[in-house]
């Protein structure tokens, strides 16, 4: 028979009483009234913030967007197949945040910061709120450093500076994404962290972009945020803010960052879908009234910080798709008014064989001129004007039979300048190569070269400089100026390449 030991029993009871935890966890729980089309109506969530994360029974997350008298309208970030009417919903007390940090580089994540590239978890403990206030006036300084895209026509005529917002706008299939990806590739070795946000794109297209970046060695300093076409509208809406939050982390550490939003038209459409399903009143083109604020609060986060704040920068290249070149539609005009300039891509120029198909006449950079390097500013001053005049003259000359010699000469030079600015995809040029090519065209040194051989001449000129005049390239890249000595060298090189080429033609 087992002997009972009262002292042992009493000590156990005392221990239980001592360890008894009286704390009570209170959670704010509601009930799903209605669900469908990625929207849930919830009753009973009294203490909930606008934009707060909600947790459904099956683990799906949602965001509270509509706070009404008797219910809360929430958007679902997932398929939510397990959520039914009558299911419980819990408020988390948190606003959406994403992981940030060095470990994110080279990875592909979804808008919640979860890896989707099959390489395992991301080892980072730092997080940042998706929605952050943009830095104020005192925290900023004016744009003064160049963000070289590697595309001659942009760096010479529509220069982009670090901290600028430059819109890339054009019809579908005119090379908008190609310009953005070229810019990322050109940042190799520049200590710039790049974030590519793909919104509503085909998964195959995103996989293709990731593969190109990997081949070119650009994925090591790039983070890809992808919300595919098959994802919930809420995720497509959140993706740009996630990209901005990831880049902001590096910006506040004093680094230069570049963010591509490809494209904000799809984000606006996702936001319109959510808003209409939430029964918000529609405005122009059925977009909600605050779609301007949706884009402005995103793009205002791009900045060049003051030296007191570490001097970091976030350069934003938002992309907008137009319908049949209509830049006066609602979303294009909104984003044009928010940004510091736009690069307009023309379908007609693209189809005529001009790549990149930049329409120089209506493309502009409002602040990038201050950031342009002296070398290219010195020689490219007249380039934009000459090309704009060439476009007008070319249109006029179709109706005129006899043109005077000066007009004829201007047309011939315009044709050569346009040929010089043609550039293959994924092959950005460094500053020295751009200076050499633009100098040859603007100074009229290739007026004798047949138009059809101009592209070949530009390639041979760049090759000659690399092989025989490496010191010229080094000097330009280091000093970023074209002094008299370098100019004389360049003239000699152009003369030599031209004579050897004309001899073989």
Swiss-Prot record:
UniProt subcellular location: Cellular thylakoid membrane
Looking up InterPro entries in the UniProt record yields: ATP_synth_asu-like_sf, ATP_synth_asu_C, ATP_synth_asu_C_sf, ATP_synth_F1_a_nt-bd_dom, ATP_synth_F1_asu, ATPase_a/bsu_AS, ATPase_F1/V1/A1_a/bsu_N, ATPase_F1/V1/A1_a/bsu_N_sf
Enzymatic reactions:
ATP + H2O + 4 H(+)(in) = ADP + phosphate + 5 H(+)(out)
Top class in the EC scheme: translocase
| Residues at the site labelled Required for activity | 363
Free-text function comment from the UniProt entry: Produces ATP from ADP in the presence of a proton gradient across the membrane. The alpha chain is a regulatory subunit.
The protein in question is named ATP synthase subunit alpha
Instruction: Give the source lineage, highest ranks first.
Output: Bacteria, Bacillati, Cyanobacteriota, Cyanophyceae, Synechococcales
